From Swiss-Prot:
This is 7-cyano-7-deazaguanine synthase. Coiled coil: none annotated. Pfam families: QueC. Catalyzes the ATP-dependent conversion of 7-carboxy-7-deazaguanine (CDG) to 7-cyano-7-deazaguanine (preQ(0)). Pathway: Purine metabolism; 7-cyano-7-deazaguanine biosynthesis. GO terms for molecular function: ATP binding; ligase activity, forming carbon-nitrogen bonds; zinc ion binding. Its EC number is 6.3.4.20. ATP binds at C7, S8, G9, G10, L11, D12, S13, V14, S15, L16, A17.
Length: 232
């Protein structure tokens, strides 16, 4: 299928892009600038598109992002350190983010005559982000079937929706994803901080997957104490 991948430049979506490139006809990568503090992830998405030899389009929705206040990703709120847990990561929720992006992505896909959109939501996000859950994916597909009825038939692919982050690392390694060129850290510094929830989750995923982590972290050992604290 001619498939457009929504790609942030993170480990999950880059792994997905490489998987789609091997299983389908990858037509383009689509990214969104919503005013996120970790905007450097978009550079990783661009590099991924160049490696895969497909177009990369960035949709500017910063005006929308500016209205979605109250999130550490779009507002002047500190990103918390610690394990990827509900009590620490709830502050990173951007209301309706995936719904907004997917609505635009379906429109772009229809205009470009694509047959599918792929999104890298995964099982580890279910307890924090409601628009990463299977029910949301199924409902959004149904909604788009009605929205594009008679105009386009586009499938929403979410192959990681029941997978763990470690599963994605294994899948990415299988398909040759360049992990070192991906960006996860929500703080958006020069290097991955190693302390925020996404950094801890990333580091733990490589450990559980048994895959070497090529990422340069400012604090490479914090993840161990964060996990010990979670398990205490």
């Amino acid at each position: 299928m001619k498939t457009l991948v929504v790609c942030s430049g993170g480990l999950d979506s880059v792994s997905l892009a490489y998987r789609i490139a091997s299983e389908h006809q990858l037509t383009a990568l689509l990214s969104f600038d919503y005013g996120q503090r970790h905007k450097k992830e978009l550079d990783s998405a661009k590099a991924c598109a160049e490696r895969l030899g497909v177009p990369h389009q960035i949709i500017d929705i910063t005006n929308i992002g500016a209205s979605l206040t109250g999130s550490a990703l779009t507002d002047d709120i500190d990103v918390p350190d610690g394990h990827y847990a509900e009590e620490t990561m709830k502050i990173t929720v951007v209301p309706n983010r995936n719904a907004i992006m997917l609505a635009i992505a379906f429109g772009v896909a229809a205009a470009q005559k694509a047959e599918a959109i792929a999104l890298a939501v995964h099982g580890g996000d279910h307890f924090i982000y409601p628009d990463c859950r299977p029910g949301f994916i199924d409902a959004f597909q149904t909604m788009q079937n009605h929205a594009l009825d008679g105009y386009a038939d586009i499938k929403l692919l979410a192959p990681y929706v029941h997978a763990s982050k470690a599963d994605i690392v294994i899948d990415g390694a299988k398909h040759g994803a360049p992990f070192a060129a991906t960006w996860s850290c929500y703080k958006g510094g020069e290097h991955h901080c190693g302390r925020c929830g996404t950094c801890v989750e990333r580091r733990e995923a490589f450990h559980l997957a048994g895959v070497e982590d090529p990422t340069l972290y400012e604090d490479a050992d914090f993840w161990r104490s964060a996990i010990e604290k979670r398990n205490a």
